[in-house]
Amino acid sequence: IFEEITNAARISKNGGGVGVNVSRIRATGSWVMGKENASGGVIPWIKLLNDTAIAVNQGGRRAGAVTVGLDIWHLDVPEFLEMQAENGDRRRKAYDVFPQLIIVDEFMRRVEAKAKWTLVDPYEVKQQLGIELAEQWGDGFAAAYETIEAELDKKIKLYKQVDARELFKHIMRSQVETGMPYLAFKDTINRANPNKHEGYIPGVNLCVAPETLILTDRGHLPIIELANKTANVWNGSEWSEVFIRQTGTNQKLLKINFSNG
């Protein structure tokens, strides 16, 4: 984990934005070195990334930009959703990162069906069942998740079942109150991934930089060359003719202070 934080610092130092998925980290109350209820969960590690973003700015131009993703099945999701709220323990807050929640289709199906959703600890799932849940998506995730739920109160002891629709409402309340998290739909992203041979996509980054390569019918081109032009872009399943609009150049950074702090 510390190695990844160091990598994030190096990227930020050179002006890059950083996207990190923390879904493999043990949940709060998990085992550490054989001791039960020893893990502090994902929040302390997110706080380290938060402080790294502040300490290591983007070449002196602006504060570091870090987005932190957590999969919707992780036991720490409820606390993750409160991570930027004004109330609660300030020691478990991280206000300078951009949280993203990684959503799978199975969760949305359960929201629609008003069904239960099970939050689990990735460490216990891997130790007891040999399943690296963070790597699963689509039908593979649905099958793995079914296996996990069949082992509740057997091999899987650390879990919590919630109403899927209530959890989705919690997400929306958090978005209204804080503007975050933004949502990354993992199955949709990976179905549209033209480079599946390189592996799966665990989450998304913050934005598109000028040198980002875009697949067009003329090959991969830096998006800056396509600014304010029409191009045929591959959307994952077909070519789409789109107008690529540059939204701004050397935009000023504004700081807004509210009366309530």
Region locations from a protein language model:
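HINT superfamily self-processing domains
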Residues: 208-261
